[in-house]
């Protein structure tokens, strides 16, 4: 049995660890561990403190991170007291824990109902309005004091932070600021400094600028950072002192907010009992991978405000609400090995071999580690236990060590595992690259990417066959694929068993030759593709499908693309300096020029599906609600018709395509005089546009 001194030391160690994590999470926007690891550690601390409270003075117990919200404010923003504490939420990890929480509410009110909604993984923000004008915007801070980030809140799109509302009484509303996953993916092309959408939202919202720079070369970065506020979105979920506004329930509160023009999560429900609650939690859990924003659980609230005072609160969280966490996406296993692989851009990815374990219904034996800094921060040790998590990713990620270690016992890889060239660090210092253009692995991965589904879609050229063709000297680049038809004799010879040399006479009987002929037919078909697919297939660093589609509006073939002034695209369509620099570097590279020269001789017949100039679009569309097909399909139809699509409503929006469970866009569209259409009307418009 542990001595009291050992238990006290353990509690102090856990407190220091959590304080450090809190500081990095709340103040530096740089989380050191995954939420699930944090929650497990906090629960361990809470349990030890409950069982051994006598080892500490009352003052020491009150100063524990288990009793406080957030972290000490260290930023330069004005520190302002909250009108009422901005508390955190207690957590439940099982149905039994949720039932235990609900029991107290049922004892006070037998007919109690509940309100359930996803728990957005964002940044808590409290907005204050006087005479309908936004006058203050406070972050959570330490729960008692927050940072007044009004100067930044005013830069966020009106759709997500209303600057004026049609309500003259003093009003305080609270919600979450977040960046959706698709927007974050675009943002990551411009900067690698954000680890996840929450980290990005916090970094942008709490960005401190105490002056406006002169208009010179240095101002460019400032202006680009200012434009980042367009990425921020919101969901608001509660009022402070709702009874003052004659609002008696959480359900009424969200309707009140929606009617005032605030974004309210449409995926929510008033539940009559716990059975209804559990059913809705199951629905949220099933659908969360299809949401375009991250959630880290579900919030369950007592719906009736009348019993909130009787339910009370602790210094850290209210008893009127609880967060139900999804814990079954985390598993414990053993880290067996770490090895590095090289991608088509030369970027190094660290991979983990783990002891097989079942996670989210699948048997897992490998996991991904983004870079060496990640391994260092988590202090991962080979042949020790680790936590792995699967939340929408195909390959799960290691999120922490089960036990504490002073440092990792795995050394950084310094040379390319394929060509042995010395690896070079990126400007950020996070990523490593092999810069040998003749590295066999880079060449292989470039060709694999070139043939992939979203590029030229040559199914018969999977990675193993490409490896074989490279090994036999049949190809050395992606362009060589189009000239395989001129090497039939060589293919027959080099891919055949020496003892059973294939000839033209018996070739027709060979399954292998049939396979080759199928491949050649696919290669010929690949000459008739949308131009954006070839752009994507080139594998230009930081140029994904979205950027490739945009580029195809400005160039209809390789020759036009090579002569395009990419600087003209700066700050348009989310094209920032990182993408522009990548494009310029790619087209100035001698080896790439040789590849492009070859591709220009292939004889592509590109389809014309995108406008060469978006300013000539015949209409502008926005979408709200759930439609009969995936949203991406409608965006594709809109763009291919020659129209433009925007996530948010703007002055230039002509049509709002409305689906089920539409949000506040419908009210904004009505006020702005934007025509609201259903799916039938939408397809009629598209059909008629093709006739003109």
Curated annotation (Swiss-Prot):
Root EC class: ligase
Residue positions of the active site: 119 (n6-amp-lysine intermediate)
Positions with a binding annotation for Zn(2+): 416, 419, 434, 439
A GO term, aspect molecular function: DNA ligase (NAD+) activity
EC number assigned by the record: 6.5.1.2
Example GO biological process: DNA repair
One Pfam family from the record: HHH_2
Superkingdom assignment: Bacteria
Residues that bind NAD(+): 35-39, 88-89, 117, 140, 176, 301, 325
CDD domains linked to this entry: BRCT_DNA_ligase_like (cd17748), LIGANc (cd00114)
Cofactor annotation: Mg(2+); Mn(2+)
Reaction it catalyzes: NAD(+) + (deoxyribonucleotide)n-3'-hydroxyl + 5'-phospho-(deoxyribonucleotide)m = (deoxyribonucleotide)n+m + AMP + beta-nicotinamide D-nucleotide
Keyword line: DNA damage, DNA repair, DNA replication, Ligase, Magnesium, Manganese, Metal-binding, NAD, Zinc
Domain BRCT: 611-692
Function: DNA ligase that catalyzes the formation of phosphodiester linkages between 5'-phosphoryl and 3'-hydroxyl groups in double-stranded DNA using NAD as a coenzyme and as the energy source for the reaction. It is essential for DNA replication and repair of damaged DNA.
Similarity-based family: Belongs to the NAD-dependent DNA ligase family. LigA subfamily.
Matching NCBIfam families: dnlj, PRK07956.1
Protein's name in the database: DNA ligase
Organism per entry: Mesomycoplasma hyopneumoniae (strain 232) (Mycoplasma hyopneumoniae)
């Amino acid at each position: 049995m542990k001595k009291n001194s050992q238990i006290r030391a353990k509690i102090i160690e856990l407190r220091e660890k959590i304080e450090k994590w809190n500081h990095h999470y709340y103040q530096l926007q740089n989380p050191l561990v995954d939420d699930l690891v944090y929650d497990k550690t906090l629960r361990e601390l809470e349990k030890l403190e409950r069982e051994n409270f006598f080892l500490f003075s009352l003052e020491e117990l009150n100063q524990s991170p288990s009793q406080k919200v957030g972290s000490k404010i260290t930023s330069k923003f004005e520190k302002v007291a909250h009108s009422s504490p901005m508390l955190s939420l207690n957590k439940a990890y099982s149905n039994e824990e949720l039932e235990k929480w609900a029991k107290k509410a049922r004892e006070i009110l037998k007919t109690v109902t509940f309100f359930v909604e996803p728990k957005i993984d964002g940044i808590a923000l409290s907005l204050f309005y006087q005479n309908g004008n936004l006058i203050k915007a406070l972050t959570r801070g330490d729960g008692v004091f927050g940072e007044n980030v009004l100067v930044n809140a005013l830069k966020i799109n009106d759709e997500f932070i209303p600057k004026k509302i049609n309500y003259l009484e003093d009003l305080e509303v609270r919600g979450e600021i977040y960046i959706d996953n698709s927007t974050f993916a675009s943002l990551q092309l411009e900067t690698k400094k954000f680890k996840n959408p929450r980290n990005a939202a916090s970094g942008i919202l709490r960005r401190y600028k105490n002056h406006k720079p002169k208009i010179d070369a240095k101002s460019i970065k400032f202006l680009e950072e200012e434009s980042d506020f367009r990425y921020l979105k919101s969901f608001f979920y509660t009022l402070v002192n709702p009874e003052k506004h004659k609002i008696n329930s959480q359900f009424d509160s969200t309707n009140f907010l929606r009617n005032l023009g605030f974004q309210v999560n449409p995926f929510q429900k008033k539940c009559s009992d716990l059975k209804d609650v559990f059913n809705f939690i199951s629905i949220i859990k099933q659908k969360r991978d299809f949401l375009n924003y991250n959630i880290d659980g579900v919030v369950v609230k007592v719906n009736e405000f009348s019993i909130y005072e009787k339910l009370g609160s602790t210094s850290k969280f209210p008893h009127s609400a609880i967060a139900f966490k999804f814990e079954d996406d985390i598993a414990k296993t053993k880290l067996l090995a770490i090895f590095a692989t090289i991608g088509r851009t030369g970027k190094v990815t660290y991979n983990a071999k783990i002891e097989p374990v079942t996670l989210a219904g699948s048997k897992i034996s490998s996991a991904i580690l983004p870079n060496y800094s990640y391994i260092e921060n988590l202090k991962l040790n080979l042949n020790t236990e680790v936590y792995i998590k699967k939340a929408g990713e195909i390959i799960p990620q290691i999120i922490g060590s089960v036990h504490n270690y002073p440092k990792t016992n795995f050394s950084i890889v310094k040379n390319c595992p394929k060509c042995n060239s010395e690896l070079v660090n990126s400007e950020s210092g996070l990523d490593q690259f092999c810069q040998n253009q003749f590295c066999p692995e880079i060449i292989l991965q470039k060709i694999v990417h070139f043939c992939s589904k979203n590029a030229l879609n040559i199914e018969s050229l999977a990675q193993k066959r490409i490896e074989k063709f490279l090994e036999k000297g049949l190809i050395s680049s992606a362009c060589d694929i189009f000239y395989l038809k001129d090497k039939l004799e060589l293919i027959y010879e080099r891919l055949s068993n020496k003892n059973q040399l294939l000839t033209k006479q018996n070739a027709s009987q060979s399954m292998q030759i049939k396979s080759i002929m199928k491949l050649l037919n696919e290669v010929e078909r690949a000459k008739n593709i949308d131009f954006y697919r070839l752009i994507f297939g080139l594998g230009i660093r930081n140029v994904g499908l979205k950027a490739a589609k945009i580029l195809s509006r400005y160039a209809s073939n390789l020759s036009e693309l090579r002569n395009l002034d990419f600087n003209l695209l700066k700050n348009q369509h989310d094209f920032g300096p990182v993408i522009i620099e990548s494009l310029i570097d790619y087209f100035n590279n001698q080896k790439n020029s040789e590849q492009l020269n070859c591709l220009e001789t292939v004889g592509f017949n590109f389809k014309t599906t995108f406008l060469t100039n978006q300013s000539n679009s015949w209409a502008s569309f926005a979408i709200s609600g759930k439609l009969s097909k995936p949203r991406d399909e409608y965006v594709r139809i809109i763009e291919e018709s020659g129209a433009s699509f925007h996530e948010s409503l703007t002055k230039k929006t002509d049509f709002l395509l409305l689906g089920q469970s539409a949000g506040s866009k419908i009210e904004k569209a009505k006020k702005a005089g934007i025509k609201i259409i259903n799916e039938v009307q939408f397809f009629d418009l598209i059909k008629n546009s093709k006739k003109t």
